[in-house]
A protein has these predicted regions:
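Alpha-helical transmembrane segments and membrane-interface helix-loop junctions
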Residues: 1-173
Length: 173
């Protein structure tokens, strides 16, 4: 599911590219139209892309890591660090923030929040909803990695069988 969401949302890149190129060309050629909506749409596209890719990115180990602590550990040792990190840090934090993000979106919707600019985009709750959805996708990504770590550590399966990727090798750096 995470992969499908990420790959589908990847099409937003085309929209973001088109809007950004038009915005730049309009400014360089001196088109006197108010471009506030386009400029806001640029960051909406960027925020949506980032938010909808975060969960999947974690499952494929595309997230930035500081591996100085685990670089000399065995893969099993790295899996234990990942287990502790998921259970005690990543999952509680992300779940808490994701849970409270729902109030953030509901409040924005109830207030009919819109851009501070008079010619900006309306429906600010929509992008806030995408932020919230992205946080819940991160929670799902953490649960996915956590399940694979548990199966690897306690289920007797190899890292290839559970498609577990933890840390970076020297070749990847």
């Amino acid at each position: 599911m995470l992969e499908a969401v990420a790959l589908t949302s990847g099409w937003l890149l085309i929209g973001m590219t088109a809007v950004t190129c038009f915005d730049v060309l309009a400014r360089k050629t001196g088109i006197p139209a108010p471009l506030t909506k386009l400029q806001e749409l640029e960051w909406h596209f960027h925020a949506a892309l980032f938010s909808l890719w975060m969960g999947y990115g974690y499952t494929i180990n595309a997230n930035p890591r500081v591996d100085s602590f685990t670089e000399n550990m065995t893969f099993r040792g790295k899996a234990w660090v990942e287990l502790v990190g998921c259970l005690f840090f990543a999952l509680p934090y992300c779940a808490l923030v994701a849970y409270h993000s729902l109030d953030f979106v509901a409040s924005s919707y109830a207030l009919a929040e819109q851009s501070d600019s008079t010619v900006g985009l309306r429906f600010r709750w929509l992008i806030k909803g995408i932020y919230a959805a992205g946080l819940w996708l991160v929670v799902l990504g953490i649960l996915s990695v956590l399940a694979r770590v548990i199966v690897f550590l306690f289920g007797g399966r190899s890292e290839e069988e559970v498609n577990l990727q933890i840390g970076h090798t020297e070749a990847e750096v």
